[in-house]
Amino acid sequence: MKLKNTLGLAIGTIVAATSFGALAQGQGAVEIEGFAKKEMYDSARDFKNNGNLFGGSIGYFLTDDVELRLGYDEVHNVRSDDGKNIKGADTALDALYHFNNPGDMLRPYVSAGFSDQSIGQNGRNGRNGSTFANIGGGPKLYFTDNFYARAGVEAQYNIDQGDTEWAPSVGIGVNFGGGSKKVEAAPAPVAEVCSDSDNDGVCDNVDKCPDTPANVTVDADGCPAVAEVVRVELDVKFDFDKSVVKPNSYGDIKNLADFMQQYPQTTTTVEGHTDSVGPDAYNQKLSERRANAVKQVLVNQYGVGASRVNSVGYGESKPVADNATEAGRAVNRRVEAEVEAQAK
């Protein structure tokens, strides 16, 4: 009677849960299963044949993968060596770990737990009890999101007798009440089609310049974009009668080089200057050496292409400060350069 009630409860739950469609896998799900098991008894037991077990289980998913399961089954068709019928029951508590994800068709599992077996001969008072430590595993195959079939095998170690028995099993079951499910990918949004008479990429209903010529870059309003001009200037100072670039000027030269690398279409002219001390011809040559020294730093130190850098000397012809004072002459001993480009 117990067995009939157990199987009836399992089958009834499967039918009811499937009918209402309130099934789900994953964390929080409840699992109901009916199963059949073949018990391969150890030779140390005084049994003539192996046993058939039928039962059911109920499980609860603590996470999407970890399930705690309570099972009950009854022993049938077992005879002792003297031909007597053997009857008994098993109660088991196992933890299962499932692989793959909730909603996948195949979810293999491994299990571990303990069971208590009470078994004895018909017509005799008293039964023998044994405690088992169990490990097992197998696959669950889902026919729908929640209705599945299972096959597995357990190794059952009899703690009381020190023997190991094997128990293959099959079952069918359902999961319901969980919260995790395969998330279907959202359909790609359909791009809105709008009229664009001048083909500038801006819809006519917001285009403030509807007749823009072809191949003209436009802003968000559909009007020709105004290019922003960006500029970098260089001003390198030199000691009297020297054309050696001082270490404290390398940072400014690098800034110019970085700008030219960012805008590879740019070129620059490096202009050398001197103060008024000395002959004009000497100062002209000195200014050219200064300009060339800065060019070499740009090219050799910072990798600017030589074809993009011109150098020219102006001698003392373009002062920016008073050459009558030492401070003014220090300002005039310089190299200047300027680069400008349209902002990206």
From Swiss-Prot:
Membrane topology summary: Multi-pass membrane protein
Domain OmpA-like, first and last residues per copy: 225-343
Annotated GO biological process: monoatomic ion transport; regulation of cell shape
Keyword terms: Cell outer membrane, Cell shape, Disulfide bond, Ion transport, Membrane, Porin, Signal, Transmembrane, Transmembrane beta strand, Transport
Signal sequence, start to end: 1-24
Any GO molecular function: calcium ion binding
CDD domains: OmpA_C-like
Record PTM text: Contains two disulfide bonds.
Coiled-coil ranges per UniProt: none
GO CC terms of this entry: cell outer membrane; pore complex
Function: Has porin activity, forming small water-filled channels. Also has a structural role in determining cell shape and ability to grow in low-osmolarity medium.
Protein family membership: Belongs to the outer membrane OOP (TC 1.B.6) superfamily.
PANTHER family the UniProt entry points to: LIPOPROTEIN YIAD-RELATED, STATOR ELEMENT OF FLAGELLAR MOTOR COMPLEX
UniProt name for this protein: Outer membrane porin F
UniProt organism field: Pseudomonas syringae pv. syringae
